[in-house]
């Protein structure tokens, strides 16, 4: 838990103000690691609990998380939420990564990232599935899409005119 809270404070923020494109630009600034550097950082994290080493491992793989999350865009869920879930998976991977086994972190982390995103999708879908017909599911996702389109303009505060706008679509 200490690693997650410490690293989370230093990660780029995926917010509604800057949006996804601003976040993607931010994460491009983090350098990729070569195999030797990755091994040394992972060893330093595992042996000494060096949080800075873990942070470098995480930040150098944020692009991988974004790429994997983009592959799940067709599920009708917010990409930024899938990226956030993927980042949690990446942190789990860094926490459990054993560099001595000879694999690169990206290979190992990919499974954790995908698992976190898929778990999020299943949680989201199961909320919809319980007692809903196909028409209700479609309505639910259309409402969610409309809400996401309107949210940036309203800053989350839905006034009567916004409710009317949604109702008329």
Label each region the model flagged.
Residues 1:
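Acyl-donor-binding surface of acyltransferase catalytic domains
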Residues 4-130, 134-153, 165-168:
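Alpha-helical promoter-recognition and RNA polymerase-docking modules of transcription initiation factors
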């Amino acid at each position: 838990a200490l690693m997650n809270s410490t690293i989370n404070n230093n990660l780029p923020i995926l917010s509604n103000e800057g949006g996804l494109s601003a976040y993607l630009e931010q994460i491009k600034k983090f350098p990729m690691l070569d195999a030797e550097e990755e091994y040394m950082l992972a060893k330093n994290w595992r042996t000494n609990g060096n949080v800075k080493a873990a942070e470098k491992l995480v930040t150098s793989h944020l692009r991988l998380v974004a790429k994997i999350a983009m592959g799940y865009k067709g599920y009708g869920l917010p990409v930024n939420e899938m990226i956030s879930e993927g980042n949690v998976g990446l942190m789990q991977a860094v926490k459990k990564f054993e560099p001595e086994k000879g694999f690169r972190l990206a290979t190992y982390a990919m499974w954790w990232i995908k698992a976190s995103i898929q778990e999020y999708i299943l949680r989201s879908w199961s909320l919809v599935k319980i007692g809903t017909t196909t028409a209700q599911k479609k309505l639910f996702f259309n409402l969610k899409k409309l809400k996401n389109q309107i949210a940036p303009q309203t800053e989350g505060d839905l006034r009567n005119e916004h409710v009317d706008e949604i109702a008329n679509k």
